[in-house]
């Protein structure tokens, strides 16, 4: 059996296309998902739901047929719809005696180490209490998050947050295909993906893999895979699909994962959104990989992007290969001034010195580490 299919804890993301029908939210679809989750609970598994549908619920409440295009109205509909969405989930799980708990997050909430740890503790407590956490984007305050596919990536970060053994994406597509099945009915599904990176490398604008919805799912699989969590992309409208797939039925597309990261390194490598990039010389790359050293200013060749002290940065080799992710001890403007210099020169250049390292090894996750 594929790794993760027997996981004790899994995150299930339910997309808007699965939850909605011609008249807004599809209550029968929600009931079917609740039935499957309840069956998993009977097996002794823990399930965290990431649910879209707040905007659709708001549209249903107001009798709107067309989704608005301007952001304030989308956010207003999300505010109207979120309590209704939770009420529908409560109704769906009521026959099984399972309580549901609302948790609203944005990806930025997980970028703060203290908020990340608080969210982690709360979700663990909810699972210990036997509740079904239902997580959604906090759409009314998260401007960038109301766009197609973002809950895919949020679900991957939630999977890392709760240390799930599997991420299941319930979608309106059957699987990842070699070609667009709408254009070519003979297009073949891809049952397994060993390297999401390789698929993403070919997901250009003219490639069906590069379309907004599918690319977001690939990015989610990459985020989860980076911290050792495999991903299943499944046709969410199919009755019993989750139970069947977890029993080993060849459904959807299975994305393999790398070796697992733990603790702060999982947070660094899987949950943070790097604000910039540092290009390192070959000596610095060797020092990080072979000696577990910290990154000193002498090893930095180039600074890309703008970031503040304490924010995450991606570390790259001169050839453009990712080396790791770390927390910067200096802002981008400061590193640009001290790059290539010895640590002893920092104070002379800046007029002050926080630390001798640009990134300390304790706050650094290398790509090959596990």
From Swiss-Prot:
GO biological processes: L-proline biosynthetic process
UniProt keyword annotation of Transferase present: yes
GO cellular component: cytosol
Enzyme Commission number(s): 2.7.2.11
Top-rank taxon: Bacteria
Entry's localization field: Cytoplasm
Annotated catalysed reactions: L-glutamate + ATP = L-glutamyl 5-phosphate + ADP
Binding site for ATP: 13, 171-172, 211-217
Keywords: Amino-acid biosynthesis, ATP-binding, Cytoplasm, Kinase, Nucleotide-binding, Proline biosynthesis, Transferase
Chain ranges of the PUA domain: 275-353
SMART domains in the cross-refs: PUA
MF terms (GO), sorted A to Z: ATP binding; glutamate 5-kinase activity; RNA binding
Family: Belongs to the glutamate 5-kinase family.
Function recorded in the entry: Catalyzes the transfer of a phosphate group to glutamate to form L-glutamate 5-phosphate.
Entries under HAMAP family matching the protein: ProB
Name assigned to this protein: Glutamate 5-kinase
